[in-house]
Amino acid sequence: KESAAAKFRRQHMDAGSSSSGNSNYCNQMMKRRRMTHGRCKPVNTFVHESLDSVKAVCSQKNITCKNGQPNCYQSNSTMNITDCRETGSSKYPNCAYKTSQKQKYITVACEGNPYVPVHFDGSVFLPATPLPSLPAPHKHRLLWLEGNNSS
């Protein structure tokens, strides 16, 4: 059986290439990477960066995954990615996709030993606030009270 890490590489890694100027990129890649077998996968993202730099995200900014799990990580810098989104006219087995190339921060879920990406959780134009560095609650209120007492 395909491991979660291998599945991540198959579905999301396309290092050393780019979709720029190729509106057919998603149609070709979604088929080539077996995401149109049995059904059309509605949305998928390919990352055009080295596997090492995507693996490194697992030691970058820890954030909560969309499903509430705590093992997601956001990249410290933007990455060259391609979003593939099924078009309205797409009908299995003739899956059709719109190709959009972007520079965004990516979020991946990581697990295992070695700790590697196993799920692509999303991408954003603006970085998130990491989990541990959220401000401690009530701190500003305490300071305000202390400031008042000294008057």
Swiss-Prot record:
Hydrolase recorded as keyword: yes
InterPro entries: RNaseA, RNaseA-like_dom_sf, RNaseA_AS, RNaseA_domain
Name this polypeptide is given: Brain ribonuclease
GO terms (BP aspect): defense response to Gram-positive bacterium
Region (Disordered): 1-25
Main location group: secreted
Entry GO terms, CC: extracellular region
Active site positions, chain numbering: H12, H119
Organism of provenance: Axis porcinus
Disulphide-bonded residues: C26-C84, C40-C95, C58-C110, C65-C72
Glycosylation site list: N62, T129, S133
Any one GO MF annotation of this record: endonuclease activity
Annotated keywords: Disulfide bond, Endonuclease, Glycoprotein, Hydrolase, Nuclease, Secreted
Compartment(s) of residence: Secreted
Binding site for substrate: K7, R10, K41, P42, V43, N44, T45, K66, R85
SMART domains: RNAse_Pc
EC number: 3.1.27.-
Source species, domain of life: Eukaryota
